[in-house]
Amino acid sequence: PNRHYTGLDITPAMIEKAKKKNIPNAEFVVGDCENFPFDENAFDAIICSNSFHHYPNPQAFFNSVKRCLRPGGRLILRDVTSDNRLLLWFMDNIELPIANMLGHGDVRVARRKTVMECCKKAGLKVEKFEIRKGMRMHCVVRKI
């Protein structure tokens, strides 16, 4: 009952679709994940699910997360990735180009190294980084 949820999408049509669901204690905002339109220390938690591969500048995303999370707050990041070089090559050179021909706007598949380096530069601590089912990243990051 005391919880408040904020949904963010860069596409106004998706925000309108979300608003029509009339979800209690929720607001929906048009905005960019690489430059969150929120105050500092605004959130206890940020969940980013299946959209990270659309962000051209991952460092800007993690910098926004750091700015908007309260101290001790957590980011839950879920997206596609792999530690398998062949699978990464396939996703980068076959899957993403086909998806983009269909209008998906994918930019890149996240790499473990990129996530770890971006978090470190932003001053965030990676508490957990798992790859499940061969290509599903589950990452928990804390603002220290």
Predicted regions and their residues:
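C-terminal lobe and adjacent flexible extensions of AdoMet/dcAdoMet transferase-like proteins
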Residues: C139-I144
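C-terminal alpha-helical "lid/dimerization" subdomain adjacent to the S-adenosyl-L-methionine
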Residues: I76-A122, E127-H138
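Short catalytic micro-motifs in class I SAM-dependent methyltransferases
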Residues: N50-S51
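Class I SAM-dependent methyltransferase SAM/SAH-binding core
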Residues: P1-N35
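Local beta-strand N-terminus motif with an aromatic residue
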Residues: F43-D44
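A conserved beta-strand element that flanks and buttresses the S-adenosyl-L-methionine
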Residues: I47
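A short glycine-rich, Lys/Arg-flanked "PGG" loop and its adjoining helix->strand segment in the class I
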Residues: Q59-P71
